Each structure stands twice: as C-alpha cells, then as structure tokens.
A protein has these predicted regions:
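N-terminal pre-ligand scaffold of iron-sulfur
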Residues: 32-119, 135-140, 158-175
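Cysteine-rich micro-motifs
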Residues: 122-132
Length: 175
C-alpha cells in the first residue's frame, strides 16, 4: 500500500511537470518550477485510523495546519521523531477528498516564519506577505497569482507524500 501511494505521488509529480512544460511552451517562454527551500524533515504519524479521522483530512476542502514549534494543532500527539518541514505542513483534502500535503513556508519569501494560509472563501492558499496565491485543492500547489506566478522561475509549494500502512496508519513524509 505504501508503494502504491509513493507511485501515485510520483505519477502526480510527473504529470505536474509535464503540464508545466506544456504550459511554458504554449506561452512561448521557458519557465521552470523552482523549489529551493532548505531541506527539512517531515514525519507526522497518525498511528490508527481513528487518529486520521480526528486529526487528518477525510473530505474535500478540509484543511489542517501542523506546526511542531507552535504545537499546532493543539492537542495533537507529536512524538519525539515528529518533524513538520521548513515552515509547517498544510494538510488539505483535494476536490476529490484525497489528502495532499504542502510545506507552509512561502516559496517566494523562503523564511520558515512567513507562511501560507488556507483561504476558506476561495479554497486556495495565500501568502499575506507577498500576495502570492496557490491552488492546493486541484493543482498540486501551483501558483495562480502574485509574485510566485509572475517570475520566470515560478515558485510552487513543496509537496510531501502521504503514505498508508497495513494497520490503518497514515504518515506524512518527505519523499
């Protein structure tokens, strides 16, 4: 099951890359995706299915923020091995209800304390500092507006894998 999830994420990332290349060619330019956030570990474990139902996302448009340094979400049982990426992890249910995970650090600002936030009115994510907006429910963290979308090396949100195990556990991990 874990291999299937990893394979799906690989196929999704390849599809995003293909769309980006095609869109760049169609626009007459050579834009490339830039993910130059510093490396940071991600290890968020939901050991049982009821933990996932409580703390994860189980339906379209649900979202939750995991920031270890701020102990968010409040009451979540982080372990000694837990890590939440460079700026935290935004966990969302995409338009089909499938979970997706993104680093919360704005890829334009590249600082761990300048984070994106989920906009419930527009069902996307945005950076209040630079004004960039990102599609997180149907376009894999691609920028849709603001400096992230306007650069020649446009900035996408860093994605993380969500793996399932044989005993009903879920893990958010860095590929």
């Amino acid at each position: 099951m874990v291999m299937l999830t990893v394979f799906r994420n690989l196929v999704r990332n390849l599809a995003v890359a293909a769309v980006c290349v095609a869109a760049g060619a169609a626009a007459g330019g050579c834009k490339h995706v830039s993910d130059d956030l510093p490396p940071a570990g991600v290890w968020i474990v939901f050991p049982f299915e009821h933990d996932w139902r409580t703390w994860g996302v189980t339906a379209p448009l649900q979202h939750r923020e995991f920031i270890l340094s701020e102990r968010l979400p409040q009451g979540f049982n982080y372990s000694a091995a837990s890590q939440t990426g460079y700026g935290g992890v935004l966990l969302v249910g995409d338009i089909n209800g499938a979970p997706a995970a993104y680093d919360m650090s704005c890829p334009v600002e590249r600082k761990p304390d300048i984070r994106i936030a989920y906009d419930e009115d527009r069902n996307d994510a945005f950076c209040a500092h630079c004004g960039s907006r990102y599609s997180v429910i149907n376009n894999y963290g691609q920028p849709t507006a603001g400096p992230a979308a306007e650069r020649d090396d446009y900035r996408v949100l860093r994605t993380y894998n969500i793996a399932t195990g044989p005993n009903g556990e879920y893990r958010v991990i860095r590929p």
